[in-house]
Design a protein with these regions (language model features):
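Short acidic/glycine- and proline-prone juxtamembrane loop motifs at membrane-interface regions
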Residues: 57-58, 141, 160, 166-173
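Transmembrane-embedded, aromatic-rich helix segments that form part
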Residues: 175-176, 205, 219-234, 323-329, ...
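Transmembrane-lumen/periplasm boundary regions of multi-pass, lipid-linked membrane glycan transferases
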Residues: 68, 82-84, 88-89, 224-343, ...
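Transmembrane-helix motifs of polytopic, lipid-linked glycan transferases
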Residues: 118, 122-143, 180, 184
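Short helix- or helix-capping micro-motifs
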Residues: 40-43, 151-156, 163, 183, ...
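Aromatic/acidic, Gly/Pro-rich catalytic loop(s) in extracytoplasmic/lumenal soluble domains
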Residues: 497-577
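Transmembrane-helix signature of polytopic, membrane-embedded enzymes
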Residues: 38-39, 102-111, 135-157, 176, ...
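Membrane-interface transmembrane helices that cradle and orient dolichyl/undecaprenyl
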Residues: 140-142, 146, 181-203, 213, ...
Length: 577
């Protein structure tokens, strides 16, 4: 009966049914494409709007100087401890912005000029936007369409993700190529296991993406995530997804070629010198990092004696929207359920390879979390999808309405997405300051990770105030003398002399009429006593806020400030360093 019925159905009904199915699939595909396009548009808008609203950080100035060195001398080892790929993209962006600014079109509309800050950050904002698409592709491959769409939307809207993409650092590019590589990797598995085609093109695409990943940031151990995922299937006799020795050799050859194409400066001897100096921790410019009001040594090799192990867990708890945190906690145990498929092991290895080393290492910055954020958001999307299904079943028990069940599920998803959307809009363009209600909201903004939350964003505005006040040849003491000098030079004040606040010898040169800059996030063991005394006893002549949060104070040196500085310098010279 069953076979007969099937044959009758396929003979009599299938033509019309197939036409209707094609229409449905076409409509669904069009809806998905429209949804993804909207996500990309919104995500791009959030990432590029007022991209130059904040001044450069000291780290970003180093990138700008590397760009200038490339333009002046060709390929060099400038900023050589970091790979070249991102710096090449920054160079192209800065050159393009200059040509845009020189065009006749912009000459008639000065408001269309692109600042150096915006040009330097644009590649990260662009690549960060398309990370949403890669998250969608990867999460859909593992967990299905719904999880893929939710995870992509979370990335597009999340204030932390936006903030990471709006700085000129390597982490965004690392994540982009990591996701691209693993999407190709999973596709190669699907093709090999199904026997529906040749997996080799996906192998070589994976290898090329991994080469670009290493040319973005020297963190090769993340390649182990994909290798570990591959390895767990090799003990299963039925597995068809096997590269073999020959294809592995080709894989690494392609990976190496892509790495060299994207990072040719690795062939320069001076680059290896820069990397060796950096790996020896001889480039650490400051002796502490302020975390939750306490100073800690921030050095990788100190391990658990450096930054607290719970640094990134505090970040997750206080810097992500609360519904996202709760959804992550719901989704995490679900990853251990077999019914979620074998692709979940890639997610579990991703967590293992990131959280285990980054929890125990002694040097930490919030931007390192860029690599972990996609896996957190994918897991949160799994939790949202699960809660939506549970809500749908709960509504079904109360109401006999298919429309109501689907409506309830959709409302839950939209409610979760509304929180990061509102959070990002409310803090724009200073996304790093976002702190959720568990962390105290705006009242505690900037108090957990001040170095990363402020990231020298107000230094440019502080210098603008100083150049209007400072007499010729005045000294300016700060923890970022190079950055101060950069903006003073742009303002036509090459006469100003820059001093390091932590250098007692240079601080001894201060005289009345000079200036001291105290920027939040720049408190260290070496300046803590002086900073505390100035903040408690002196009145700043200039105060600069980042949004609604005080960020920087400028003190004019008079007799009282000079006495305070002298006592601190004398105390250090007596052996109290």
């Amino acid at each position: 009966m069953s076979a007969s019925a099937d044959s009758v159905e396929s003979g009599a009904v299938a033509p019309e049914l197939r036409i209707e199915q094609r229409r449905t699939r076409t409509a669904s595909r069009a809806l998905i494409i429209a949804g993804l396009a909207l996500m990309l548009l919104v995500g791009f808008g959030l990432r590029v709007t007022q991209l130059g609203a904040e001044g450069l950080s000291e780290d970003e100035l180093n990138k700008l100087q590397a760009v200038e060195d490339y333009r002046a001398h060709g390929l060099t080892a400038a900023n050589g401890e970091h790979p070249m790929l991102m710096k090449a993209l920054l160079t192209a962006s800065v050159v393009a912005a200059e040509r845009w600014n020189e065009s006749s079109f912009v000459a008639g509309s000065p408001s269309l000029r692109v600042s150096t800050e915006a040009a330097l950050r644009f590649p990260g904002a662009l690549f960060g936007t398309f990370i949403s698409l890669l998250i969608y592709l990867l999460a859909t491959e593992i967990f299905g369409l719904e999880v893929g769409l939710i995870a992509a939307a979370l990335w597009a809207l999340d204030p932390s993700g936006i903030s990471f993409n709006r700085i000129a650092k390597e982490d965004t590019f690392l994540v982009f190529f990591f996701l691209l590589a693993n999407y190709f990797w999973l596709r190669s598995q699907r093709v090999a296991e199904s026997g529906s085609g040749r997996p080799e093109p996906y192998y070589w695409a994976t290898a090329a993406a991994f080469g670009a990943m290493l040319a973005s940031k020297y963190l090769p151990h993340f390649f182990g995530i994909s290798v570990s995922y591959y390895w767990i299937f090799q003990g299963i006799k039925a597995t068809r997804w096997r590269l073999g020795r020959r294809r592995w050799l080709i894989f690494f050859a392609v990976m190496g070629a892509a790495f060299l194409i994207c990072n040719p400066t690795i062939l320069l001897p001076q680059t290896w010198h820069e990397m060796r100096v950096f790996a020896g921790e001889k480039r650490i410019g400051h002796d502490a990092y302020e975390f939750m009001g306490t100073l800690y040594r921030n050095q990788v090799t100190l391990w658990l004696k450096g930054m607290p192990w719970y640094f990134y867990y505090v970040f997750m708890g206080f810097k992500l929207p609360v519904p996202v945190v709760l959804s992550f906690l719901v989704g995490l145990p679900l990853l251990f359920r077999e019914r979620f498929g074998d692709g979940r092991f890639l997610i579990l290895f991703w967590m293992l390879f990131w959280f285990m080393p980054f929890t125990v290492m002694g040097g930490k910055f919030t931007r390192y979390f860029t690599m972990a954020l996609p896996v957190v958001l994918i897991t949160a999307a799994v939790g949202v999808s699960f809660m939506g299904q549970w809500l749908r079943l709960a509504v079904a028990r109360l109401f006999d309405s298919e429309a109501l069940k689907n409506y309830a599920r959709a409302v839950l998803v939209l409610l979760v997405l509304a929180f990061p959307a509102y959070a990002s809009i409310s803090v724009a363009p200073h996304y790093r300051l976002y702190t959720n209600v568990l962390g105290g909201g705006w009242e505690r903004a900037g108090s957990y990770f001040p170095h990363d939350e402020f990231y020298d964003a107000s230094v440019r505005d502080g210098v603008r105030e100083i150049v209007a006040l400072a007499p010729s040849g005045a000294r300016v003491a700060s923890e970022t003398p190079g950055l101060i000098a950069h903006y003073a030079r742009l303002a036509g004040r090459d006469d100003l002399q820059m001093l390091s606040l932590s250098d007692r010898k240079s601080m001894a040169e201060l005289r009345e009429g000079d200036f001291i800059i105290i920027a939040r996030g720049r408190r260290y063991f070496s300046n803590d006593a002086l900073v505390s005394q100035l903040e408690s006893e002196a009145t700043p002549v200039v105060s600069v806020s980042l949004g609604r949060v005080p960020a920087l104070h400028v003190y004019a040196v008079d007799a009282r400030e000079l006495a305070a500085v002298s006592s601190r310098v004398k105390g250090k010279s007596d052996g109290n360093e």
